[in-house]
């Protein structure tokens, strides 16, 4: 079973995030996660390319999760969202 701390550590070690938010939507069961990842690695990439990058980097844990929802932003996009 995957927990939010393990997922956060893996994201920190593989995606160079400047901001991470992780919610376990399964009540602590580790089967349904929603994540927000802000990383300069996403700069200039389409949404599909960002998701593919995340899926590739996290493939070892995603295979054990029933549902994984991701929102991926570049630092500039995240700043713009926060300014609204």
Swiss-Prot record:
Q: Pfam families from the entry?
A: BolA (PF01722)
> What InterPro entries does the entry give?
BOL2, BolA, BolA-like_sf
| GO terms, molecular function | 2 iron, 2 sulfur cluster binding; iron-sulfur cluster binding; protein sequestering activity
Q: Which GO terms describe its cellular component?
A: cytoplasm; cytosol; nucleus
> Per the UniProt entry, what is one GO biological process?
positive regulation of transcription by RNA polymerase II
- Family, per the entry? Belongs to the BolA/IbaG family.
Mind telling me what this protein is named? Uncharacterized bolA-like protein C8C9.11
The record lists the organism as Schizosaccharomyces pombe (strain 972 / ATCC 24843) (Fission yeast)
The organism's lineage is:
Eukaryota, Fungi, Dikarya, Ascomycota, Taphrinomycotina
